[in-house]
Each structure stands twice: as C-alpha cells, then as structure tokens.
C-alpha cells in the first residue's frame, strides 16, 4: 500500500494490517521501542513506524535512504504530534544504503545540493519545490484546456531567432562551420522561443499555446538566468492588448489558486523554510485586481521618486530606459501595492514583431510586474501591417528572407493577434519562494555547468 493511501484512508484502516515499501528518512533506537520515519515519494508527509527494539535487529541496522518492507497495524496516537502511526509486526531490510550516503539528516546548503542534483529531490525542501512545479505544470495545461486552447509542440531545432538577440545555441554536425554541407543545409539552432510558430497555428485554431524547453546561450551567472528553461507561450488570433492583459491575469490567478487547493502542505513548508510571508504574498496576488500603468506614466512616477529622494542604482530616468528590477518593484510594491501591468513601451527596447502604436514611438507591449521580483510575464499585440513589419525588420537588421514564412502570414488574412511568454522557472520561484533558478529545475544548465 502507498503511504499516501494510508494518510487518506487511515480512519478506515484502524487495527488493520497494512504492508508498506518505503525509504528510511530516520531510524531512532530507544531502550524498549524504536522509531523509523518512512516515505515512499507518494506524499509530502512522512509516516512514523514504531517497532520493538528487541528482536528487530534487521530494522535497527537500516540506515538513512535504505529500503524496507513493513507489515503492521495502523493505530491512533491522539496524544502525539501525528494523528496515527504504524506499529510494526515485521520489518524486512530490502536494500541497505551505504554508510556515507551523501544526504544525511543534518542540514545541507543549496550549493552542495546542486552538486548532487540527482539526489536532492529526496530532501524535504526539494521534494516540496518539485511537487509544486509538477502541480503548476498541470494547472497550466488544465487552464488552457478549459478555455479551449489547442496545445502545439513548436520545434526545438529552428533557423529562426524570435528574439533577434543572437544568443542561440548552434546545432551542427560539422567542425568547419560550412552550414551548406551541414545536416539541414543551413545554419540551425536550438529555439529561443516558440512564439513565431504559435502565431502561425493561431491563424488556424484561434487559441493555441506552447509549453516546452527553450535555450539561450547567454553567459549570465545570475540567480535568474539558465541556459535551458521552460516557457509558456499562448497566442490568440483576433485579440488585442486588452484581451491579452485579461488572459495573463486569469492564468496567473488560476495557477496560484490551484496550488493553494492541491499543495497547501508544500506551500506551508516553503513559507516556513524558504520565504517568510510567502503565503501572504501569494494571497495578495490571487485576491488583487491587477493595476494598469503605461510606460510613460511609470517613467514620470520614477522621475518624481528620484526628486523626492528615493535612491535607485540607475537613477537617470528618461523615456527609453529599459526598466530594471528595482524600478519594476518600486512601481508595483511602493506605488500600486498590487500586481501591475505596464503597457506601451518604446519600440527601441522591444522586439520587432510588436504592433507599433499610432504615436510611432511606442509598441503595444505589456509586462506583468509582481511584488517581490518585478517582471513575471512579457507579451504584446503583434504587428499586423506587412509593410510596417518588413520596415521594422530592416531597422533592426533581421534577415527578412529567413522570416519570409512568418512575415507572409500578414498576406493571407491576418486581423490582430496577441500573446505572451511566461518563464516557467520564474513562476515556480515566485510560488515557492526559492531564490535561485538552479533550485527549481531538476537538472539546471548554466554557464560552465553540465554535471548530469
């Protein structure tokens, strides 16, 4: 029987025999009675097994992480911390872990645990993080399914750079960079975004989304950057920026509400161990009406803050500034005191595909800023005018021949389209309170780090 089932059905199992296979978390010997803490991975909560010290020599030898089979009875323990326990009749040591098993009961640093990423999910902290990650991924699929979105698998290998930043990993079978003789007959790279392909499918299905790995060869050794991460990228035809904003708000609230309902114990653990006040922060997001501020208004607010004596690391605030985390957090934490959408950014600091506004200075872009981290989501309405799109590609030196298929979507009946990108790891960091992206992805890929 799974330990999860015992917790769910314990009242109906009283004094009944159960058989459990589990992993030893701790094994404490007493004079007459000994205590073994077990978990089999099916539940966050550990199960206490009580056995007589005399006559259970095999059980006494079981080290941390060893596998045991327990046959015993479920008994109530109202006077103790746990509601019930299993009193063992038989304990069989199935497989003994080595004495110097790397994860002993003592506290380990996150830096050390990153070096043993293949084992760290067995700790309570990473068990909670990865349970929440799994639940959040399911919630995303469920949200879009309920809204009748079509899930598409955008390609991992591509010849397009959707961001135009040139920070892509090359995919090649050659050492001489002669791409015409390469596998695809041209230069290929790992995808930095599935958005362009999602736009094409949105013209067929109206509402689509991608959810898959993306790659950036950006040599950034920060707590927020990884070379491989997952992105959620919805795209909706016939939608404008206002529709996009509503979809972002609905999705973020849905995911957080799902975690509150289905992973409350893990959330409480993260609140205790990773970020004090985490639950209050998340409650603020899921219960708030998100605010909307234009980029121009945000610049004026920041200018006034500098005049009033507020210290920013970047205090030269002018139109055209690419807002930093300190500016984003000031807007949503100090001014609006709520999650905030900032809209209509200068076109020079945004991607080529964003719809140009009538002022010819800004584009119909939106970023969602949340208390604690700043930007969580970035999106836009897409440029629907073919001539404007071609002109913008040329202005930012994007090869229009490479993107002919994408640009030509505007020639086949194209009336509005909008979408956004949400970095999944950044979302998991926000929900769990983890402070480093390396701690929310099972096997992190960062500069000079390819351990597994």
Curated annotation (Swiss-Prot):
Organism: Mycoplasma mycoides subsp. mycoides SC (strain CCUG 32753 / NCTC 10114 / PG1)
Reaction catalysis annotation: tRNA(Asn) + L-asparagine + ATP = L-asparaginyl-tRNA(Asn) + AMP + diphosphate + H(+)
Keyword S-adenosyl-L-methionine in annotation: no
Keywords: Aminoacyl-tRNA synthetase, ATP-binding, Cytoplasm, Ligase, Nucleotide-binding, Protein biosynthesis
GO cellular component, one term: cytoplasm
InterPro entries: Aa-tRNA-synt_II (IPR004364), aa-tRNA-synth_II (IPR006195), aa-tRNA-synth_II/BPL/LPL (IPR045864), Asn-tRNA-ligase (IPR004522), Asp/Asn-tRNA-synth_IIb (IPR002312), NA-bd_OB-fold (IPR012340), NA-bd_OB_tRNA (IPR004365)
Superkingdom to which the source organism belongs: Bacteria
Entries under Gene3D superfamilies matching the protein: Bira Bifunctional Protein, Domain 2, Nucleic acid-binding proteins
Matches recorded under NCBIfam families: asnS, PRK03932.1
Biological processes annotated in GO: asparaginyl-tRNA aminoacylation
EC number: 6.1.1.22
GO MF, one example: nucleic acid binding
Main location as per UniProt: cytoplasm
Family, per entry: Belongs to the class-II aminoacyl-tRNA synthetase family.
Subunit and partners: Homodimer.
Locations listed in the record: Cytoplasm
Enzyme class: ligase
Protein name in UniProt: Asparagine--tRNA ligase
